[in-house]
A protein has these predicted regions:
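Solvent-exposed interaction patches of small proteins and small membrane subunits
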Residues: 1-96
């Protein structure tokens, strides 16, 4: 993963962290449950976006970039079938 991708993920996670703190504060202050659920939904969506960005980076650097210039330095040698299986596993982890 390149430096810009790491920075982008870190920024997104910092936002999620702030949203979680906001959720805790809302619960502590006894806010209206529907408002808390709305914030919870937004937090979950933000975390899903982190997962999508990370999966995209993995596909770009470890699957599509396998054996090329963009390959991640920790990518394992894989055959064509293993690359397809890696993509299947990546997608299944994202949609769980």
């Amino acid at each position: 993963m390149d430096v810009e991708s790491r920075k982008s993920l870190d920024r997104r996670l910092a936002r999620v962290e702030g949203q979680v703190r906001g959720l805790r504060r809302m619960i502590e202050q006894g806010e209206y449950c529907c408002d808390i659920l709305t914030q919870l939904s937004a937090t979950r969506s933000a975390l899903d976006q982190v997962g999508a960005e990370l999966a995209t980076s993995h596909v770009r650097t470890c699957i599509v970039g396998h054996g090329g210039e963009t390959e991640h330095d920790k990518a394992k040698p894989m055959s064509g079938d293993e690359l397809i299986e890696e993509l299947r596993v990546t997608l299944s982890r994202l949609v769980r």
